Structures are given as C-alpha cells and as structure tokens.
C-alpha cells in the first residue's frame, strides 16, 4: 500500500471516529436524524462509524479488516447519500457523505487488490 493510500485511510478513519462520536453524543445530530426520519438508527449509525473508523486503522496492519471496514463504510455512506437526496438536501449537505463514500470505495478497491 502506498503512502498516499495510507494517508487516505488515516484521514477517513479520523473523520469517521470524530463524526461518529458527534452522532452518538450531540443534540444537533439527534435533530438531524429526526429530520431524516431515522431517529431510531442514530446510535447504531454512530457506533458503526466509530467502529468502522477504528477498523480502518486496524486495517493498515490487517488487509482483511481493511476490506470489511472500508466496504461497510462505503455502503453506509451510500445510504447517507440516498437519505440526503430523499430529504431534498442540496449538494453542500450531500458532498461529505459522497466524498467519504468514494474515498472508502477507493480504499476497498486497493485493499481487495492487495489480498
């Protein structure tokens, strides 16, 4: 794995651990999930983001874990993009989920090639 890919992995991991923590522990994210009509999934989503971010870091040492973490996070962000479209959010609101989906799909592709 190249240094550039490692940087993408670490950046994605930091973003997911940070954002997942916000989802779990802040009122603003509680309101967002209510707006999405997905309040009952807020804790699970936050936990998956934090665990996925941690999995990306472990995946730097274990490619199999990187495949699972990046694949799961790419799928989670696909659902995030679909949700943003469904509630008619604009590009600015949708772009973070879209960018993280693409980044993790890229990580997944690299990890699969390394197996």
Feature annotation, model-predicted:
Residues 1-115:
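Membrane-interface extramembranous regions
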């Amino acid at each position: 794995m190249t240094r550039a890919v490692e940087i993408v992995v670490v950046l994605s991991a930091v973003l997911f651990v940070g954002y997942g923590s916000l989802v779990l522990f802040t009122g603003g994210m509680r309101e967002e999930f209510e707006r999405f009509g997905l309040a009952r999934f807020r804790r699970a989503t936050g936990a998956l983001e934090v665990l996925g971010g941690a999995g990306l870091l472990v995946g730097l040492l274990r490619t199999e874990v990187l495949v699972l973490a990046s694949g799961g996070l790419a799928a989670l962000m696909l659902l995030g993009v679909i949700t943003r479209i469904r509630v008619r959010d604009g590009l600015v609101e949708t772009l973070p989920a879209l960018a993280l989906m693409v980044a993790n799909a890229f990580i997944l592709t690299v990890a699969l090639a390394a197996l």
